């Protein structure tokens, strides 16, 4: 919508303009619920799934917003089996799902998936509230512990309510290998964040043996936004090329965004 100049002009006449909200803003999170409803409806329309058949959802996340939207969709009745939380090397969410303890007391790592470089996952508070039985006092206490001690732990009873979640992470090396392998196998190029999700999904299948459930991977960014990291992963020979040269490479078999095309 942000690239639709006709719609932008129409809104301008009416005195409105589009804006974007940070992922902590509930105004951004709630519309994301529609992503998963739409994806499910499209799978059903295309005959990929039967009516009421459950699917898995994989989301690359640092701030826990997009995957929380999937959680809300599931709670609203969308047939979702597993919510697969994919982290990069800043794996605070993976550790939380593995141990029940959220601990931000660790080194911050700069990765090729910068939108996920987060140690305080603000939207997780909303999930904690739900699994705490909507107990605002208990939720507040844990957030205060995070603020003062840098960590908090949930109870066994709360952990039991996370059975539908699976968490894992990929290293920088694994992320690059995922990009390269997918391109070599299919000719399709994904960005670094989507590669984290794809890599974690591979680990999920190995860990669980669940290879039959239809699965949606949320591709949260365009490879054109991270051309340097993406092309370095495919072949180091591209390292000497400029960013605009990388965008123009014919091996990227998807259309570049309109406004980027105008710049280049």
Q: Locations of the language-model features?
A:
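Structural motif
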Residues: 15-19, 55-56, 81-84, 187, ...
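A hydrophobic, small-residue-rich beta->alpha segment in the mid-to-C-terminal subdomain
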Residues: 230-251
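Active-site-adjacent helical/loop segments in soluble small-molecule enzymes
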Residues: 3-7, 12-46, 51-54, 130-208
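Structural alpha-beta junctions
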Residues: 9-13, 78-80, 237-240
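Glycine-rich phosphate/pyrophosphate-binding loop at beta-loop-alpha junctions
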Residues: 48-51, 56-145, 218-234
């Amino acid at each position: 919508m942000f690239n639709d100049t006709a719609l932008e002009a129409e809104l301008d006449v009416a005195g409105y303009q589009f804006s974007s909200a940070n992922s902590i803003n509930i105004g951004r999170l709630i519309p994301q619920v529609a992503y998963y409803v739409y994806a499910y409806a499209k799978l059903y329309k295309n005959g990929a799934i039967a009516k009421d058949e459950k699917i898995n959802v994989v989301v690359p996340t640092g701030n826990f917003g997009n995957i929380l939207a999937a959680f809300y969709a599931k709670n609203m009745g969308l047939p979702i089996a597993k919510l697969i939380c994919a982290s990069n090397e800043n794996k605070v969410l993976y550790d939380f799902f593995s141990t029940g303890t959220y601990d931000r007391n660790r080194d911050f790592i700069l990765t090729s998936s910068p939108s996920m470089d987060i140690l305080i996952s603000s939207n997780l508070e909303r999930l904690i509230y739900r699994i705490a039985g909507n107990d605002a006092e208990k939720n507040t206490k844990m957030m205060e512990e995070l603020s003062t001690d840098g960590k908090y732990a949930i109870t066994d009873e709360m952990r039991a309510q996370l059975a539908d979640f699976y968490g894992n992470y990929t290293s920088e090396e694994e992320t690059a290998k995922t990009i390269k392998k997918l391109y070599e196998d299919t000719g399709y190029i994904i960005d670094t964040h989507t590669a984290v999700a794809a890599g974690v999904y591979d680990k999920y299948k190995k860990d669980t043996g669940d290879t039959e459930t239809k699965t949606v991977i949320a591709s949260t960014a365009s490879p054109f936004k991270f051309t340097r990291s993406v092309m370095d992963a495919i072949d180091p020979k591209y390292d000497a090329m400029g960013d605009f040269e990388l965008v123009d490479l014919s091996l990227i078999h998807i259309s570049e965004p309109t406004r980027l095309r105008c710049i280049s």
